[in-house]
């Protein structure tokens, strides 16, 4: 591989590494969405909640605005966190009135785990490609990274649909919501992993013949 392509590959792998770190942060943190109920009286305590793929945390925040809304209130202070019941059946998750979409939650978590698995396998291929004449391993690595990005954006969409159904449900007290920084990390990771995988595939392809009478086999090998 030429020095120019080597430099491009290294820069691309750096951005992919950043995407992998963001994906890991998004999966293990609990700030995908923030939920809050509607207040019936002034000067009430707002029970805001934030949750991720695995657990949910609640905190009571004093609200003094006049619109009786906890919208965009950030949970702070002492928090009460609990894993979703379908991930930890032995733990009581009835710490507050909350309705989850079990199928959506399990699907989003499972797809996110697949994404991390693709990142790990792609990283192994990329690491092995630095050996002598193993540039061909960059091609499967690029595909694994692209698949990881696709899995991550699917997980994001499943989570978004879960929040939407939760808010629209008649059995929940939560009427306000917004997506937080873990959700943003997942979206940024998708962009870096998917585009990084495509660029890595492009840079790892063999040099095309420069003249019509050349074939791929006759072209000068790259070092």
UniProtKB/Swiss-Prot annotation:
Recorded coiled-coil stretches: none
Stretches that traverse the bilayer: 11-29, 110-130, 136-156, 181-205
Topological domains, Cytoplasmic: 1-10, 131-135, 206-223
Extracellular side: 30-109, 157-180
Domain of life: Eukaryota
GO cellular component: L-type voltage-gated calcium channel complex; plasma membrane; sarcolemma; T-tubule
Record's protein name: Voltage-dependent calcium channel gamma-1 subunit
Post-translational modification: N-glycosylated.
Subunit structure: Component of a calcium channel complex consisting of a pore-forming alpha subunit (CACNA1S) and the ancillary subunits CACNB1 or CACNB2, CACNG1 and CACNA2D1. The channel complex contains alpha, beta, gamma and delta subunits in a 1:1:1:1 ratio, i.e. it contains either CACNB1 or CACNB2.
GO biological process, one term: positive regulation of muscle contraction
């Amino acid at each position: 591989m030429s020095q120019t392509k080597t430099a491009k590959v290294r820069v691309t792998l750096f951005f992919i590494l950043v995407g992998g770190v963001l994906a890991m942060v998004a999966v293990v943190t609990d700030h995908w969405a923030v939920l809050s109920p509607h207040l019936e009286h002034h000067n009430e305590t707002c029970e805001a909640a934030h949750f991720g793929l695995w657990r949910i945390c609640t905190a009571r925040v004093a609200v003094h605005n006049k619109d009786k809304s906890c919208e965009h209130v950030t949970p702070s202070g002492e928090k009460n966190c609990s894993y979703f019941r379908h991930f930890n059946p032995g733990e009581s998750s009835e710490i507050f009135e909350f309705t989850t979409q079990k199928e959506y939650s399990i699907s989003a978590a499972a797809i996110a785990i697949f994404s991390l698995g693709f990142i790990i396998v792609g990283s192994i291929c990329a690491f092995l490609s630095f050996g002598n004449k193993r540039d061909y391993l960059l091609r499967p690595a690029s595909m694994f990274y692209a698949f990881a990005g696709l899995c991550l954006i699917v997980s994001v969409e499943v989570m978004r649909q879960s929040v939407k159904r939760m808010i629209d449900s008649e059995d929940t007290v939560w009427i306000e919501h917004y997506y937080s920084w873990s959700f943003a990390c997942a979206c940024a990771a998708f962009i870096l992993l998917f585009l990084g995988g495509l660029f890595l595939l492009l840079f790892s392809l063999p040099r095309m013949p420069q003249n019509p009478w050349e074939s791929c086999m006759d072209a000068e090998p790259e070092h």
